[in-house]
């Protein structure tokens, strides 16, 4: 959103009965502003450059001829696709020097009819280039003895992407009188994400005897992701009489996503150590090619009603509140792919040159000319939520109490195009009901001091696609849905102290406790792990088959902590600081590989269960931020420096004892400086990530091959680094111009 459209950002640490219950971590509410009393017309222009592309090129591919629909969608379900139905330009890659980033926005607003009606309109455009490098080491194989990780590959990736964002925002408001007003807000935003990835995949298990050897796959992936969202919200505030007020809101939203002709061109070779110590390289041969179309559409209709009845009881103000919510959401997902097999042109395969010289079997067409639409990724799903609440608010001179209860009913269902006689995942449904009581106290200790206490229940509802049988490989591992996923339910306690010492100076301190039943986490499964508790080919469960990421419920978790924040100004200099400590813990049975007879090293390896105690996935014990602000209104200079620290946390959980992926702590910094040239114009400079922050993810296992170079990218012997991502700074210069 352009900043001129935002009136304020509201952060709620706890919930009252009128708020939706799906908010274990609290609520952030973006309040948009109405048209101001005076005319508004502002322009902002910004340009910048990513340091990544100063020393490294941008990997580009052609997008003009990408077909937005697959042959199945264009010609119908009985059409036999041929090679001429597929462009080759999106698999022709070249290195270029990208143009600078370009960002712009324009805002106009005005009031009419004696200030009763107002309109504010904004448009924005962004063309941003991004680049990064990383490596990733998956543990796709079952762990070895004593849970030594089953590392299989070393992926070295270089990403280049262009993000083109467009947005149009409008807000109309009309004040009938001081007690009655309506507003209509509309938002349309679109994103085109054009991404290329160059990857070198070196096997750590096939032919890897010394550094520089092993089976190697080289691939270039082209992926265009198109997204757009439209939302229209109509709302009204009405003071019916001195006691009764009514608020209502209805919202209609549509979101579309499309991956058209997402493809990856790859070839394979091998570097094998010879008996004399030399290394021989085999010819580079073309690998099979898959071309994917994936699209989805979500439609959401929501209606809210809030009734407040106020009356006086002795020296207190009593407010009785009631209301409800109805939401209907529908999601339609479509997935299709075509598989091309290389033609055999030599006794070893087909030597690879480029996409224009590649030859495929089936007359250069796909092996499955009808496509592959009958899969769990082609489905329709719906979600219906009904909610109601009742609360009492009692306000005295010092204390304010709010107590009440909220109920929510949820009904989710899906049906896919899977043939039920061939596979699982045809259809399913989930229904549940929640009662969410809450109580809050706000006590005014003095004019400058406030004490707040609250207790409430909340929930976390899985996304609609997470409870289907979808299975898509977005990156170096599969992502799968989980229809057996349960919602999380939390009991929350919170105590907070606030001190307002004048001006913008604030100190806040608090403690909190949460008990979370059925928390769900992002878990990485290796090929043999259970994906679903459904019998499959003689097994009592369905195995993942490949490295797979899936949302899973964990045992009941307990989390508690403290937080403190402060804002203090010393003349022109301001300091903003905050710190949060969180302790979270779950105990769960994990698998461990050991000998059937520990005293006999030749006995069979078997899996046993060990209890493991660890934090929740994604929960860092330490979060800290520090901001330095400088403002000189006389000279027109403003500057800011902000740092955010995130402590170590579990990046991805594992069902194997001691094999969670741990992300190291990291610090991110941003800096900016602004100069006011006159009453209507400002220029600014901004730099993001000047520290060249690197993201490191480790297995907390000793590194037996450290020093031998068999696993690249390692810097320590006491752990195994499985992911390292590097992004360089981005520099921006811009202009803010108020034309009125």
Where are these regions (language model features)?
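A beta-strand signature from Gram-negative outer-membrane beta-barrel systems
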Residues: 3-43
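Transmembrane beta-strands of outer-membrane beta-barrel pores
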Residues: 47-51, 125-129, 188-195, 252-258, ...
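Transmembrane beta-barrel wall of Gram-negative outer-membrane proteins
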Residues: 88-198, 228-230, 241, 437-439
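Signature of Gram-negative outer-membrane beta-barrel scaffolds
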Residues: 191-193, 290, 310-311, 315-448, ...
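Outer-membrane beta-barrel signature, preferentially recognizing the C-terminal barrel domain
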Residues: 212-235, 373-386, 430, 459-516, ...
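Surface-exposed extracellular loop regions of Gram-negative outer-membrane beta-barrel proteins
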Residues: 358-368, 447-492, 511-549, 642-656, ...
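Gram-negative outer-membrane beta-barrel transporters
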Residues: 513-515, 533-649
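C-terminal beta-signal and adjacent terminal beta-strands/loops
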Residues: 518, 645-653, 675-740
